[in-house]
Swiss-Prot record:
Entry GO MF terms: triose-phosphate isomerase activity
Name this protein carries in UniProt: Triosephosphate isomerase
Pathway linked to the protein: Carbohydrate biosynthesis; gluconeogenesis; Carbohydrate degradation; glycolysis; D-glyceraldehyde 3-phosphate from glycerone phosphate: step 1/1
EC number(s) per entry: 5.3.1.1
Reaction equation(s) it catalyzes: D-glyceraldehyde 3-phosphate = dihydroxyacetone phosphate
Organism the protein comes from: Shewanella loihica (strain ATCC BAA-1088 / PV-4)
Gene from which the chain derives: tpiA
């Protein structure tokens, strides 16, 4: 059985301050105990430099704990007249290791289709970034028992355009749309059922990828439900939204992942 290192990725969305970065690293330096889990901070692009400075300033204090930096989005284009966009190379130069791709808010609010998501996935890997690919179903889709159908479609487009082995350097985050930012989380059993489906789907085309890829759960994860979620055999950590803006709650989630 593969030993998949748990991950806790904090997606600040359009929130946060440079002060939050400093506060988080102050607590990381004194509270994070080991490298048994990987911690990723995904602030708005304007704060990437603040997070990078904190990473550099606290390198010794972190004592080998795995704290990385990620972005919330990138352009599928390398350069050009795309006002307001940020390329993969720019993110790489800023110190990012990860980038969130296909978040439900991007798909819903900005019209990102599965084809665009697949292009962004490729752009991330082209520039040495590891994509955190988000997939998930809406409330009506779940009620219609179309959860697996929706997730399979979102996965298959990326596989068709990038190949299965592209997932050797990728993370998947299952984020049920009906749980994102609602305070209503999937039960551990619901999360495990979908994570197992995703792993099986990838295993059918590559047993190695299916066994080794990390699959995060995202959708109203809090310190009160994280232990049960992270204890599921196919749940490898969490993509955290609101709780990532509270340094005490986020640190608690990191500690839970390290003990999972």
């Amino acid at each position: 059985m593969a030993l998949r290192r748990p991950m806790v990725a904090g997606n600040w969305k359009m929130n946060g301050t440079a002060q939050l970065a400093q506060e988080l690293f102050t607590k990381f330096a004194t509270k994070l105990q080991n490298d048994s889990a990987e911690v990723v901070l995904c602030p708005p692009s304007i704060f990437l430099e603040s997070v990078r400075q904190q990473l550099d300033a606290n390198k010794e204090a972190l004592n080998g704990c795995l704290v990385r930096m990620g972005a919330q989005n990138l352009s599928q284009h390398d350069f050009g007249a795309y006002t307001g966009e940020v390329s993969g190379q720019m993110l790489k130069d800023s110190g990012c290791r990860y980038v969130i791709i296909g978040h439900s808010e991007r798909r819903r609010m900005y019209g990102e289709t599965s084809d665009i998501v697949a292009e962004k996935f490729a752009a991330a890997q082209k520039h040495g970034l590891t994509p955190i690919l988000c997939v998930g179903e809406s409330g009506p889709a779940r009620e219609a028992r179309r959860t697996f159908e929706v997730i399979a479609e979102e996965l298959d487009v990326v596989i068709e355009k990038n190949g299965t082995m592209a997932f050797d350097n990728a993370i998947i985050a299952y984020e049920p749309l009906w749980a994102v930012g609602t305070g209503k989380s999937a039960t551990p059993e619901q999360a495990q059922e979908v994570h197992a489906f995703i792993r099986k789907r990838l295993s059918e085309v590559s047993p190695y990828i299916g066994e080794n890829i990390r699959i995060l759960y995202g959708g109203s994860v809090t310190p009160s439900n994280a232990a049960d979620l992270f204890a599921q055999p196919d749940v490898d950590g969490g993509l955290i939204g609101g709780a990532s803006l509270n340094s005490t709650e986020f640190l608690s989630l990191c500690s839970i992942a390290m003990s999972a």
